[in-house]
Regions:
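N-terminal Rossmann-like or analogous alpha/beta NTP/dinucleotide-binding catalytic cores
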Residues: 2-131, 276, 286
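Short, polar/flexible loop-turn hinges at active-site or ligand-entry regions and domain interfaces
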Residues: 50-51, 140-144, 228
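Short catalytic-loop micro-motif centered on adjacent basic/acidic residues
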Residues: 76-79, 142, 225
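Short helix-capping/linker segments at secondary-structure and domain boundaries
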Residues: 99-103, 135-142, 246-256, 282
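Conserved nucleotide- and phosphate/pyrophosphate-binding catalytic cores
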Residues: 18, 149, 155-326
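Short, histidine-centered active-site or binding-site loop motifs used for metal coordination
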Residues: 8-10, 41-43, 139-140, 197, ...
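Internal, conserved structured core segments that host functional sites
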Residues: 112-161, 165, 185
C-alpha cells in the first residue's frame, strides 16, 4: 500500500482553503493509502510565537483534522515536535543541501522581502519539510501549488543522498488537487488565503458562524463588468469564488460558470453551500473539543505510531552517512 504524508502549520485558525485544499483530500486518502498527517508546530517557529497561543493553536488544528473526518484508527495524526527524529534528520539533510538552492526558494524570497530580521529557520524551512516527508518512506505528498518547489527540493535531496551514500530514502511524488488547490483571499485575490495574515473579511475560518460566512462571501471582491466568466488572470476575485464553489459542491468549474449570469445569485448559493458543507464538521469539532483530554490523547497515540517508523528511517540514514550507532 502506498504511503501518503502531508502536514499543516499551527500558525492560526484553519480556514476553508485548508479544508478544500488539504483536509478533505486527506480524509479520502486515508481509505486507500497508509496515511500519515502531521501538525507541523516546529515550522510555526520560523516567526516569533506566543507560547500559550502556539500550544492552543496546535491543539485546535489537530481537533479540526479529526473533525474533518480523519480517523486515528485508520491513519496516523501527530504533532511534529512529538517525534524528535524530524529535527535529527533535518540536520543530515541540511548538510546535503546547498545555500544556493535554498536561496532560490520562492517562499523564502516572498516572506523575507522587506524584513530587517529573518530567522535562519525560515531559510532552512524547506529542509525540515524534506525531513518530514522522507522520514516516513513517503510515496505521495498532497501539496498546493505553492509547495511544489519545496517538494522538488525534497526529491533532489533524496536523490543526492541516495547517490552519495546508497539507497536510503524513497523519492516521493507530488499530488495536486485539480480544484481549489490554492484558495485565495476573498479581499485580496492575488494572494493565498492564509492563517498567518490578518484579513478578517478575506478568510473564512472553519469556526465561522453561518451568518459570518454569508457576510464574507457577499463582500468578497469581484469586478465591475458583471459578466460571470472564469478568467483567473483578468477576473481573479470572481474566478476564486467559482473555484471555491466547484470544490464545495463537487461540480465542475464549467458547470458553475454556466449556471449563473449575475454575481449576486452565485455568491448567495456559494455561501449556502459552504454553510451546509461545514455544518457537520463544526458539529464534530464541538463534540471533540468538549473533552479537553481527547485531542492530546489522540496526538500521543499518533506520535507513538509515527515514531516507530521515523526512528527506523533515521537509524538507516545515520548508518549510511557514517555516524556511530548511539
Amino acid at each position: 500500500m502506498e504511503r501518503v504524508f502531508s502536514g499543516v502549520q499551527s500558525s492560526g485558525s484553519p480556514h476553508v482553503g485548508n479544508y478544500f485544499g488539504a483536509f478533505r483530500q486527506w480524509v479520502a486518502d486515508q481509505q486507500s493509502a497508509d496515511s500519515v498527517f502531521c501538525v507541523v508546530d516546529l515550522h510555526a517557529l520560523t516567526v516569533e510565537q506566543d507560547p500559550a497561543q502556539l500550544r492552543s493553536r496546535t491543539l485546535e488544528t489537530a481537533a479540526w483534522l479529526f473533525a474533518s473526518g480523519l480517523d486515528p484508527g485508520v491513519c496516523t495524526v501527530f504533532a511534529q515536535s512529538h517525534v524528535p527524529e524530524h529535527t535529527g534528520l533535518s540536520w543530515l539533510l541540511e548538510c546535503t543541501a546547498t545555500v544556493g538552492e535554498l536561496r532560490r526558494m520562492t517562499q523564502f524570497k516572498e516572506k523575507s522581502k522587506g524584513s530587517e530580521s529573518v530567522s535562519a529557520g525560515l531559510f532552512t524551512y524547506p529542509v525540515l519539510m524534506a525531513a518530514d516527508i522522507l522520514l516516513y518512506d513517503t510515496d505521495k505528498v498532497p501539496v498546493g501549488d505553492d509547495q511544489r518547489q519545496h517538494l522538488e527540493l525534497t526529491r533532489d535531496l533524496a536523490v543526492r543522498f541516495n547517490g552519495r551514500y546508497g539507497d536510503t530514502f524513497v523519492v516521493p511524488e507530488a499530488v495536486v488537487p485539480k480544484v481549489a488547490a490554492r484558495v485565495m483571499d476573498l479581499q485580496h485575490p492575488e494572494r493565498k488565503m492564509s492563517k498567518s495574515v490578518t484579513s478578517p473579511l478575506g478568510t473564512i475560518d472553519l469556526i465561522d458562524e453561518p451568518e459570518t460566512i454569508r457576510q464574507k462571501i457577499r463582500k468578497a471582491v469581484t469586478d465591475t463588468d458583471g459578466e460571470v466568466r472564469y478568467d483567473p488572470e483578468h477576473k481573479p476575485g470572481l474566478s476564486n469564488l467559482i473555484e471555491l464553489f466547484a470544490a464545495a459542491s463537487g461540480r465542475s468549474i464549467e458547470d458553475v460558470t454556466a449556471s449563473y449570469d449575475r454575481y449576486g445569485p452565485l455568491k448567495a448559493d456559494l455561501a449556502e453551500t459552504l454553510v451546509e458543507v461545514l455544518a457537520p464538521v463544526q458539529e464534530r469539532y464541538a463534540k471533540i473539543t468538549a473533552d479537553p483530554e481527547a485531542v492530546p490523547r489522540l496526538l500521543e497515540m499518533g506520535a507513538r505510531k509515527a515514531g516507530a517508523v521515523a526512528s527506523g528511517t533515521l537509524r538507516r540514514a545515520r548508518q549510511a552517512i557514517g555516524l556511530l550507532a548511539p
